[in-house]
Amino acid sequence: MEKIGLIAGNGSFPLAFARAAKQKGLTVIAVAHEGETLPELAQWVDSISWVKVGQLGKLIKVFKDHGVHDVLMAGGIKKTRLFDGALPDLRGMAFLARMIHKKDDSLLRAVAAELESEGITVRESTLYLDNLLAASGILTKRKPSKEEKLDIEFGWQMAKEIGKLDIGQTLVVKDQAVLAVEAIEGTDEADRKSVV
């Protein structure tokens, strides 16, 4: 049976991937992050190993020991864990010391490069999850109003700017005013802040 590795963060995304991969008949080897990954992931995978944020050497060893050559990352890790609660192993310490910028995109690309250097291919996170991807176009029963279209365009421009700055991935707007911007606290907190 083909194996796939799962680097699991928080939320339901890792569970959705594990279920989809099992339905495809794959053996799922998961590395889960303490304090982030939902414990019920263990029910959906063939093997689960728990690590603390920064234990990159342990993470790689798990996949190598199981003969895993393809992995993907699913779910987030609260960025605050890098500064509070991380317990990096030697490889993780060396990795973090090399990182000039600890921005989300920089970290993810560097982790992927580290895995690739060990012969582990990082696959797209939506592998086997096409059914969860939104189709292009209008997804509701009605078209956006003129005002909503202005908000969409305004929000798109603002989102591209915060993306360039690597601040976050979520932005909430209304009446062409920014109500919330995702920062270190994450998407869910940005959503909570925006409720009016």
Where do the protein language model's features map onto the residues?
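Short glycine-rich anion-binding loops that position phosphate/pyrophosphate groups of nucleotides
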Residues: 10, 76-79, 177
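Conserved small/polar residues in nucleotide/adenosyl-binding loops
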Residues: 195-196
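N-terminal glycine-rich phosphate/adenylate-binding segment common to multiple enzyme folds
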Residues: 56-127
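N-terminal beta-loop-helix "entrance" segment that forms/cooperates
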Residues: 33-53
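Short coil/turn connectors at secondary-structure junctions
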Residues: 1-3, 24-27, 45, 66-69, ...
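Internal active-site segments that recognize and position negatively charged phosphoryl groups
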Residues: 111-124, 134-188
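N-terminal basic/disordered segments at the start of proteins
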Residues: 2-33
